[in-house]
């Protein structure tokens, strides 16, 4: 049986929780630069790019080379458990770009939810205030704190009570 968008989306519906929404009714098979091909061979221009995390496009040669080189050294470790130099180097480079004559520190996280949660904690610690303003209809993530900030209930927290 050949793969189709419809058949794979049916499998997705059976295997993946409904909280992980999907905007487009296609299943990507491969991508390059700003182009994505679905499992049926149709070509699309990728305007989302991983929702703002893919600034270089799919399979940028420099990104692929850096990933390949890193895979020969270390695939993954939790920095909080075992530090590694590339993490420190990236933080140093980001810190150097931040304007101002004061000490800077950078935290690298995996998701936007983690970034939002840490930003809220930092803001609360810096101001001594507990309140946070969130806009109606805004999306901030899927963790408990970020769902509480997210003004878009459906599909993220519908039927779950107060966050």
Residue ranges and their predicted role:
Residues 50-51, 55-82, 89-107:
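Glycine-rich phosphate-binding segment of PLP-dependent enzymes
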Residues 92-163:
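PLP-dependent aspartate aminotransferase-fold enzymes
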Residues 5, 29, 33, 60, ...:
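Generic structural signal for well-ordered, non-membrane alpha-helical segments
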Residues 1-32, 87:
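Active-site-adjacent loop/helix segments that line or gate small-molecule/cofactor pockets in enzymes
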Residues 25-48:
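Active-site and channel-lining beta-strand-loop segments
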Residues 12, 16, 20, 71-75, ...:
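Structural signal for hydrophobic packing residues in well-ordered secondary-structure cores
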């Amino acid at each position: 049986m050949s793969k189709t968008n419809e058949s794979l989306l049916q499998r997705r519906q059976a295997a993946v929780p409904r909280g992980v929404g999907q905007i487009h009714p296609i299943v990507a098979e491969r991508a390059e630069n700003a182009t994505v091909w679905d499992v049926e061979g149709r070509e699309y221009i990728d305007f989302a790019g991983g929702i703002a995390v893919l600034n270089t496009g799919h399979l940028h040669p420099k990104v692929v080379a850096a990933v390949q080189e890193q895979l020969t050294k270390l695939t993954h470790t939790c920095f909080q458990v075992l530090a590694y130099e590339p993490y420190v180097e990236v933080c140093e480079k980001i810190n150097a770009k931040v304007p101002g004559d004061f000490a800077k520190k950078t935290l690298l996280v995996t998701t936007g939810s983690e970034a939002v949660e840490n930003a809220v904690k930092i803001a609360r610690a810096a101001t001594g205030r507990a309140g946070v303003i969130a806009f109606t209809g805004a999306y901030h993530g899927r963790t408990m704190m970020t769902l509480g900030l997210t003004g878009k209930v459906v599909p993220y927290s519908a039927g779950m009570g107060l966050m």
